Amino acid sequence: MEKLRVELGERSYEILIDRGNLSLIGERLLRFSISKKIGIISNPKVSELYGQKVISSLQKEGFEPFVILIPDGEHYKDYFWAYHILTQLLEFGFDRGSFLIALGGGVIGDITGFVASIYMRGISYIQIPTTLLAQVDSSVGGKTAVNHPLGKNMIGTFWQPSLVWIDVDTLESLPEREFISGLAEVIKYGVIWDKEFFEFLEINRTKILKKDKDILISIIKRACEIKAEVVSKDERESALRAILNYGHTIGHAIETLTGYSSYLHGEAISIGMVHEAKLSSMLGFLDKEDFEKIRNILKEFGLPVNLPINMDSSAMLKTILLDKKNIEGKIRMVIPDSIGKMKINFEISGEDLKKVLNE
């Protein structure tokens, strides 16, 4: 088992990475001072695959698990379904000592964390991410949110989990498209932080795409190490943590304007990374060779790199102006200076951004 730690003082927690460890979660939770009542938040597909294994493990140790299901999909990560979960918790009699488990991908993790942060002014929860994207990104760091029709993740909190429990065997059931989508976030870590990791991904592309378990554990661990280091230094995104938003300014706009139905999150982020790198190159920072490397690795892993054909640049710009990184109406983005080095919260003119979007 690989063990990492996110250092945040009293809110520090472990990330545990292994194979076939879902059946051990009940034993692990005995270490926490919690009541016996545990809510498992999941979707029907994931619950059918892994729910009973988690339930049996919890019951074996004397816990009382309750399952709350929400539909699968980004467009269900909204206040209506958060309210539904809150209602269920109240009806089941959950109190401040109760505990939540997010069993699923990024949508489940985000909405579970959000509910945990506001239910009775905050209860504990753990992340059991079952998608690659959630394992390397959204399960770590304590960002929680639900979407709003005007923008993604606009309503949210910072609420750290008590534990992140990763079983790479869950990736066996992950649809290929979702697996590839998760690789966008993995590649992002190489671009923003670690050139050697970027090169490792280039070299081991075939093994990664074949889902070699040892390689998967290796890349998940390195991605989590990078995110844990960043979050430990800047929990609430006052400066450094913004680096993790590379690709997300344009990516989130794509998701919003397509109604979260045309692109998976990683696919939109891939397009965002390419065009934010192109913007950096146009401004004279990122050299052409590094831009081509970023574009090529994403393309070679099977990720999209081009904007939707009918995407209106004016609508994109209007959506980007609502981005959380902006201050006083000024667009601030994270753009690569070189592979492994970034410019954080760099101010971009609307004119330059539209130029890149229209190319």
Swiss-Prot record:
NCBIfam families: aroB (TIGR01357)
PANTHER family: 3-DEHYDROQUINATE SYNTHASE (PTHR43622), 3-DEHYDROQUINATE SYNTHASE, CHLOROPLASTIC (PTHR43622:SF7)
A Pfam family recorded for this sequence: DHQS_C
Cofactor: binding comment: Binds 1 divalent metal cation per subunit. Can use either Co(2+) or Zn(2+).
Protein name: 3-dehydroquinate synthase
UniProt-annotated binding residues for NAD(+): 72-77, 106-110, 130-131, 143, 152
GO MF annotation terms: 3-dehydroquinate synthase activity; metal ion binding; nucleotide binding
